[in-house]
């Protein structure tokens, strides 16, 4: 399985969409616990609409998002706390179900995991893939 990841932290909607199209991504899998954003266009519904305009499917898998205490740890630079908290999140039954959905969706069509952080090293999307798709070929997109 090949899967892309992308963050929208330092980009415009145009650059974001162009990066996805250039990579051949056909589906965005939003793994934010709270799919709202202060960045224009990146909240769930506007994002879904913008993606649809360029022929990219949108799926939100909320249970794969980082819980509030994990987001606080990430903002404070407490990577070990983030890793511990997120590992607990992935042990929840709904996260297990959505992890399987993520793998199925990614196997079906070229897909990109979406979160805020530009750098995947500081984002839970890297933790998710390491835990739930360790053999996947991963390409990080940087719009």
Ranges and model annotations:
Residues 1-143:
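Residues lining hydrophobic/aromatic ligand-binding pockets adjacent to catalytic sites
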């Amino acid at each position: 399985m090949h899967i892309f990841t992308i963050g929208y932290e330092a980009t415009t909607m145009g650059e974001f969409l162009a990066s996805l199209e250039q990579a051949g991504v056909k589906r965005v899998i939003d793994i934010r616990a709270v799919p709202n954003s202060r960045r224009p266009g990146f909240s769930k519904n506007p994002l879904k609409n913008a993606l649809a305009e360029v022929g990219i499917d949108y799926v939100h898998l909320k249970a794969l998002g980082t819980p509030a205490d994990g987001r606080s740890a990430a903002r404070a630079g407490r990577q070990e706390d983030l890793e511990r908290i997120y590992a607990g999140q992935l042990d929840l039954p709904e996260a297990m179900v959505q992890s399987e959905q993520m793998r199925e969706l990614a196997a079906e069509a070229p897909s990109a995991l979406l979160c805020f952080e530009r750098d995947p090293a500081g984002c839970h999307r890297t933790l998710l893939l390491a835990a739930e798709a360790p053999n996947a070929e991963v390409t990080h997109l940087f719009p």
